[in-house]
């Protein structure tokens, strides 16, 4: 049980790190500070990757503990805790509750960050529409360098959507 407690504590700390990184990303999105968005996004991905690795380690550990206790290998952490005596049960349940709350907070932040990013893209589209003149029609005939009338060359466009 000590190994499980240690792993849950590590997982909770990594979940806190993910929440922190998502809050950083939200602050950058809200401030329209695009320079560092790629870095912040990479940091979120790294922290999330570490959390996923720890979740996998926990799943393996829980399956092993379940096997030792004669429980089904597909047992969840909550089901395993029902078979654990005190004081471990309370301590492990408390840690699992904290982890669950952090995961819910992270989900909410991901959704909020997505809305901020969408809003930023719409603002950029609107700005580009005000700054750049509309492209000429494809069939517009202009005078070219030679002094003769020529079809207008297609203009380059800025892609703001992936």
Where are these regions (language model features)?
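Extended, charge-rich alpha-helical scaffolding segments
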Residues: 1-80
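Short terminal interaction segments
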Residues: 76-162
